[in-house]
Amino acid sequence: IGADMQAQVEANVGGTRHALACARAIEAGCFHHVSSIAAAGLYKGTFTEDMFEEATGLDNPYYRTKHDAEALVRRETGIRWRIYRPGVVVGHSATGEMDKVDGPYYFFPAIRQVSNALPGWLRAIMVQGGSINIVPVDFVVDAMDYLMHARGQDGQTFFPPDPKGITTGDLVRVLLQAAHGPKLSIVNGGALEKLLAQVPVGRLPGVVPLTRALGAVMEKYGIPEEALKFVGYPTRFDSTKTRKLLARGGIECPPFESYAGAIWTYWEEHLAPEARSGR
């Protein structure tokens, strides 16, 4: 997500343009385009499966190029197409297996440090934050396979979703639990402001040097600045049409809490910095 504009254009827009040209050349029956919820940008409110032009907040190269790549497919008239916008894809729900580190994984080293530094009986607080749509890769594969073969769906866009999503606060709470870290209580922004108001004003500078601390954490763990936008993610995705179709095939996204342990264990054993350096 932190790559520069040129690299993103070449990979996302240029790659899609070449793939469409190939599909036309071989006279493919249908072009199946894997887009992303990023095509909606940072739209404030509910973004449906039928919305596209309404996307806003496309300043980031990743959002911009995902949107522009999908636009190429939508304008295509020489071949039939279907578009899939999965959420934030993580590892296999049973094994935790994953081949890359991005999205929530950026924050795993920091969560591990907190878990190692603080006792499990300690109770901490965190704001609830925005809702994130996280999906395990095996669910995405099963969902796309079913949707690709569903009759009469050409020209449609699908959200293979976690129908409930998970707030940033609950995501951190579940990951801390998987890492055997401190227990986390989730509060809304108003409650946190009320709590901070009880701290003597003279002590605030020593309590929350937030900007400096946040910058140090991001630099230490290589967290891209753009990844912080997930903390207050403003978009809710309506996946009513997709969920109705998937229900016919008995396909349903498991809640993140049910497979967080597998995701965490696989990361520690295979994707953590020291695990990768030892390969």
Question: Model-found features: residue ranges?
Answer:
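Conserved Rossmann-fold NAD(P)-dependent oxidoreductase catalytic core, especially the SDR/UDP-sugar
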Residues: G2-Q6, E10, G14-P61, W81-R82
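Active-site Tyr-X1-5-Lys
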Residues: A21-C22, T56-G87, H92
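Short-chain dehydrogenase/reductase
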Residues: V9, V13, L58-H67, V101, ...
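A hydrophobic C-terminal alpha-helical subdomain
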Residues: A110-V127, K194-R248
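Amphipathic terminal alpha-helices
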Residues: E226-L228, G232-R279
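Alpha-helical substrate-binding/gating segment
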Residues: F108-I125, S131-K183
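Conserved catalytic Lys-bearing alpha helix of Rossmann-like short-chain dehydrogenase/reductases
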Residues: V13-A19, T65-V73, F107, V140
